[in-house]
């Protein structure tokens, strides 16, 4: 598998695998509350990652186009040779991933024999949320569509 994907992609798989594994271990020991704690932790981690991406790209603003730029800094190297598909309308950013583009969450779900929704809702989407909040703390994330073939994420700011 690693021959097929970039080092950046594989780093994403490793990070998500570790987070999902710990989340499941804590859930087994402490119950469903552990899932909420893990989601909150992943949002915080996404915010820290977003701050690093902002610094790397020299992004200082807090607008929707700034969030879009940070997402490109984050995801373009991961999904290369593909590019992140984004669309901005007003204060709404739509991010779309379509097959043949693969994301690390799909690989993690397959490797761990988990529903994609579990990996995305607990880890991947929380990273999206945290990274958006690094640019604008009032950013709101929602997942419109989630499947192996197509995912649509929406970020809105007031």
Predicted region positions:
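N-terminal accessory segment detector
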Residues: 1-120, 138-150, 157-158
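ATP phosphate-binding glycine-rich loop and adjacent ATP-lid/helix-beta elements
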Residues: 119-128
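Low-complexity, intrinsically disordered Gly/Pro/Thr-rich segments
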Residues: 127-143
């Amino acid at each position: 598998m690693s021959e097929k994907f970039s080092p950046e992609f594989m780093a994403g798989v490793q990070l998500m695998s570790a987070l999902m594994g710990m989340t499941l271990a804590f859930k087994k020991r402490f119950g469903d509350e552990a899932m909420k704690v893990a989601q909150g932790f992943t949002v915080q981690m996404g915010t820290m990652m977003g701050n690093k991406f902002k610094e790397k790209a020299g992004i200082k603003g807090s607008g929707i186009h700034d969030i879009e730029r940070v997402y490109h800094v984050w995801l373009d190297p991961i999904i290369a040779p593909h590019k992140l598909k984004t669309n901005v309308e007003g204060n709404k950013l739509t991010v779309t991933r379509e097959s043949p583009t693969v994301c690390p969450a799909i690989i993690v779900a397959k490797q761990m024999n988990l529903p994609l929704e579990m990996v995305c809702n607990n880890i991947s989407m929380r990273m999206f949320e945290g990274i958006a909040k690094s640019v604008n703390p009032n950013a709101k994330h929602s997942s419109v569509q989630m499947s192996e073939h197509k995912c649509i994420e929406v970020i809105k700011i007031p």
